[in-house]
Amino acid sequence: MASDHQTQAGKPQPLNPKIIIFEQENFQGHSHELSGPCPNLKETGVEKAGSVLVQAGPWVGYEQANCKGEQFVFEKGEYPRWDSWTSSRRTDSLSSLRPIKVDSQEHKIILYENPNFTGKKMEIIDDDVPSFHAHGYQEKVSSVRVQSGTWVGYQYPGYRGLQYLLEKGDYKDSGDFGAPHPQVQSVRRIRDMQWHQRGAFHPSN
């Protein structure tokens, strides 16, 4: 019934969020399907997340229950093992998830050197930036103002390291977006209909 998801103009409509968590790698073993927030994955009967299939997203997962700890952004696609959804490779724990609301096609973000939106700043509009250094910005990122769109920031260039979900709003210091240090060196937009066949860190060209 794919036609249910098409308008007369042929443009895809946003789908209800849907993600399937499997206990084993490569989509094997016991599984559980989610269509809304899940504060504790173990309460669904899934002891450990071994692989993830996102049928409609995007989603954000967390290392700890109740949306705490390291963050992992999932877009529509297949994540056959834990290291396909984390590039920090610090933990294989995935304990809670929630859908990400994507309500804007336009994207604008301002990153500031110091807390409370002070110091040097870099403004990004409708673009992904794999390296702040290449754009001449070598400062730390201590506060962020997301004026439109939904973004994910990364600790290192090339979309590597810890991930930080940046939804519309103000983040007065790095702790507000979950960063242990004011270090963000790349950022990209989250768009509702993106497809990553092998997970967000192996985009097809």
Swiss-Prot record:
Residues 102-106 are annotated as: Connecting peptide. It comes from the Eukaryota. Pfam families: Crystall. PROSITE patterns: CRYSTALLIN_BETA_GAMMA. GO terms for molecular function: identical protein binding; structural constituent of eye lens. Residues 2-16 are annotated as: N-terminal arm. One of its GO terms (biological process) is lens development in camera-type eye. Crystallins are the dominant structural components of the vertebrate eye lens. Homo/heterodimer, or complexes of higher-order. The structure of beta-crystallin oligomers seems to be stabilized through interactions between the N-terminal arms. Has a two-domain beta-structure, folded into four very similar Greek key motifs. Belongs to the beta/gamma-crystallin family. This is Beta-crystallin B2. It comes from Canis lupus familiaris (Dog). The gene is CRYBB2.
